[in-house]
Each structure stands twice: as structure tokens, then as C-alpha cells.
Amino acid sequence: MNKLIRRAVTIFAVTSVASLFASGVLETSMAESLSTNVISLADTKAKDNTSHKSKKARKNHSKETPVDRKEVAPVHESKATGPKQDSCFGRMYTVKVNDDRNVEITQAVPEYATVGSPYPIEITATGKRDCVDVIITQQLPCEAEFVRSDPATTPTADGKLVWKIDRLGQGEKSKITVWVKPLKEGCCFTAATVCACPEIRSVTKCGQPAICVKQEGPENACLRCPVVYKINVVNQGTATARNVVVENPVPDGYAHSSGQRVLTFTLGDMQPGEHRTITVEFCPLKRGCATNIATVSYCGGHKNTASVTTVINEPCVQVSIAGADWSYVCKPVEYVISVSNPGDLVLRDVVVEDTLSPGVTVLEAAGAQISCNKVVWTVKELNPGESLQYKVLVRAQTPGQFTNNVVVKSCSDCGTCTSCAEATTYWKGVAATHMCVVDTCDPVCVGENTVYRICVTNRGSAEDTNVSLMLKFSKELQPVSFSGPTKGTITGNTVVFDSLPRLGSKETVEFSVTLKAVSAGDARGEAILSSDTLTVPVSDTENTHIY
């Protein structure tokens, strides 16, 4: 009887796995790798301990070959409904299907049961991930009668029990117990399947940005003196403010160095609590009151504004500088700096600072303190309507565009006054292209070769362009080949090279012509060089003795 039960349990386990495969829960490769491990039957205490026949039967049973086991999954003895002394069914054993997908399902049934006495079937579903709409289907044994289930359900026409779980979280377990009553002897086969939809949850954090703007600026300022405003922007909300933009129209009577009438500052995204500061500087052009208004806007929010009103007083100081627009390198250039007080206030502690670009050398600046490329004049007082003039003599060592910046600072009852000016001079270099011609073999025998080498060098401070070279040889020499930075052409006893587009300052290029001595005599080779800088072509002659 025990052997029969062992075989029945093994068939049941395989049938359960097959049912899972047929329901689509298991893939073929997974089903092939599954195995069933059945807990051996617990020894049941014989009712007649004195029966020798029973002992012999158990002894013979222990010598039988173990049932061929196809291990599918770990087998666990159920602790929920273990065998009791007065129960009509054996210990529970569990068949577990390992599935790393959505839901893991196990089924526990007794090793044996008694006809006419109910026995339990325990189904446990474990969430491998968050799932919804979990449907568990239990196929009732054919030769058994449904008694009850927990949770309660009603069998379908084809003998199936169906439970629906709205949601099964990851790691969460759901247990179902079904009681059935076997109607006749034999094996009661049962199978359970599960279907589930994986659940994905997303979280969107909602908040409200709140952009505030404040502005700081002077109450009084002087005409033509810089007026600086600080615009402070802060996000006092709970969410990120997107695409924050600050617009600051230039007030009437003000000018900005960019020449624009509306200044726009793109701050991008601002996190909660983030603070930004913008500094704007204007130059007042007329007296009176001027109000600077800054407006901040952001995506989906209201615009906020902040304003500061400044009273503009009389002008304080003016400065200008004049000099040559262009000059040649190493040629002195004089700049004239003019400082004046067009207002009605006395200027005190006037400082005139002239800063020259690197590469420019100060040659002379009367009454000034010279330090490297900086020249400074100081004046104790500059009365209204009074003007001062300073001269500085400079020279550039290299070609290029250099700017001379002048800043005047002073104090008055109106406060600190500053004015600035600049002058730019373009310093040009001068190209100086030279040529040198030599022959490598002299004298040479008739039939031998010699090479004429022509070196072209730009010794000047500027590049030369369209540099062309032509060579003419007497009848004693016959050009054979040539080389150089450009292509050439041999026509009779003349070699012409294509123009070189550019010859940089201090750059040298070399041309060479290989010649064959064809007759004895005092041969001559003439090189003619021309370029955009050379108004008249330059020629050089080399002689070669042929014997």
C-alpha cells in the first residue's frame, strides 16, 4: 500500500507541474528543469503492534528500491495541518514551483486520505514582485466532492475553483485552503495555476515655486558716473522654478554699455531656497529722477517686479583720449588725454590712470608715474569748467590692434565720480623679403650635374603674399629637375615656380633646380623674385664654371 501511495504522490506532483506548464505560467525550458521531491511517508504507528505480519511487511518495504525521483523543487512539510492522532489523512507535503517572474505558487496535500473523510488542499501564492489582478485556479480531483474553501468560492461547471486577488505585493503571501471529500479509492489528482499582471508604480512630486525679486541701488548719483543696481532673485517656494528670466529695461536717461534698451538675464532653473544676484551698471545721461525696474518671470508663474529710484545730480568729470588709428611697428605714436569738469562742483583727489596693452612700451609721459604699461597722473583739485591735458608717447614692438584705456576717478560733494575713455590703434608690420642664390658644385665637368639653391626669407614683421620665383640659365646649363614649396614648370632653359600665397614674418622657404652641364664655358643662372610687397622684382645672378 505504501508503494502505491508513493507512486500516486509522484504522479500527482508531476501532474501539478504539467498543469502549470499547460496554463502558460511555465516556459518549456523551465518546465524541463523542474523536478519533484516527495517527502517519504511518515511511519504510521501500527494499530496492532503484535502483528508479525505487519512488521515483516514494513521490513520488506524498507528493502524496496526507492521511487525514481525527478527533483523539481524543495519539498517542505506543511506545518499548518500536520497529521493528528485522530485525523483521517496523512502528513501534508508541499510541491513548490520556482518561478522568478511574478508570483510563486506552492500546493500542499496529504500523503493519503480516507474515503468519505474530507482532507485539505493548501495553496500558497507569494508575490515575486508587485502584481495586480492575480487569479488562482484550482482543478478539483475527479473522484472527490468539494466541501468548502477559505476564502469561500463556488466550483465552476468543469470542476474548477477560482479566486481573484486584487493586489499581491512583493514578498506578500496569500493562502487558500480547500477541503474535498474523496468518494472512492484511488489517486486524487489536483492542479493549481496562477495568472498575474505585474504592477509598476510611479510617483510625481508636486510643489509650487515662488520667485521673489528685490533690488538695491543708490538714492543719489552723478551724471555720467556709473550707477550700479543689484537685483536679488530667490525661490521661496517648494518646487523648482523653471526657465527663470529677469528683464531690466534701461531707464529713460540711462545708457548701458551694450547699447541695448532692454537687458535680459536667463537664470534657468532655480531650486527651492536658491538665491541669485544680478549686477547691472548704467551711465546717467541727464539730470532728474530715474527709476530702474526689474521684472522676473518663470514657467507657469506670475511676474514680479522690484524698482529703485535714483536722483541724478550735475555732471562731475569727463575724459577723452585721441591718437592715431594706425601706425607702423616701432614708430612712436602720441596719445592726448583730456580731463575736464563740466559741472559746478569742485572735484578733489583726481586720479588719471592710463593703461596700455601688453606689447606697447611707454616712451614718454610728462609729470606722470610710469610703472610697466601703466601711467598715472594725480591732481588735488579740478574746478568747475577747468580742463587738463596730458600726453603719452608709446611704441608697439609687434603688429596687432592695441587699445589704450583711460580711467579718471575723483571725489566731490556728489560722491565718487568716474569716467573712462579708450583709443585703439592698429600697428602694422612691414614685410622684407630677401633672396640668396648659390650653386652646390662649381666648377663642373661637361655631363655632370650641379644644383642651384634659392633661399627666400621674409625678415620683416609682417607677412608677404604672392611670392613668385623665376630662374633663367645660359646655354651651358640645361634644367633637369626642380623642387620647392610650389609646383614649377621647365620651358627650355627657364624654370618658373607657381606663386607662394603667403610667406610669414621670419619665415624661410627654399627652391632648388638640378642642372646638367652641356657645354664648356662660364655659365650664368639668374633668379628673379617678385611679391605684393616688392614693387620692383629683385634679381640675383650666380655663375658656374664648366670645363
Swiss-Prot record:
The keyword Signal applies. Its main location: periplasm. One of its GO terms (molecular function) is extracellular matrix structural constituent. It holds the Pfam family DUF11. The keyword Signal applies. Residues 23-40 form a propeptide. Residues 1-22 form the signal peptide. One of its GO terms (cellular component) is periplasmic space. Gene3D superfamilies: Immunoglobulins. GO terms for biological process: regulation of cell shape. It comes from the Bacteria. Residues 45-84 are annotated as: Disordered. Keywords: Cell shape, Disulfide bond, Periplasm, Signal. Residues 62-79 have a biased composition (Basic and acidic residues). Residues 52-61 have a biased composition (Basic residues). It is found in: Periplasm. Part of a disulfide cross-linked outer membrane complex (COMC) composed of the major outer membrane porin (MOMP), the small cysteine-rich protein (OmcA) and the large cysteine-rich periplasmic protein (OmcB). In elementary bodies (EBs, the infectious stage, which is able to survive outside the host cell) provides the structural integrity of the outer envelope through disulfide cross-links with the small cysteine-rich protein and the major outer membrane porin. It has been described in publications as the Sarkosyl-insoluble COMC (Chlamydia outer membrane complex), and serves as the functional equivalent of peptidoglycan. It is present but the disulfide bonds are reduced in reticulate bodies (RBs). This is Large cysteine-rich periplasmic protein OmcB, serovars I/J. It comes from Chlamydia trachomatis. The gene is omcB.
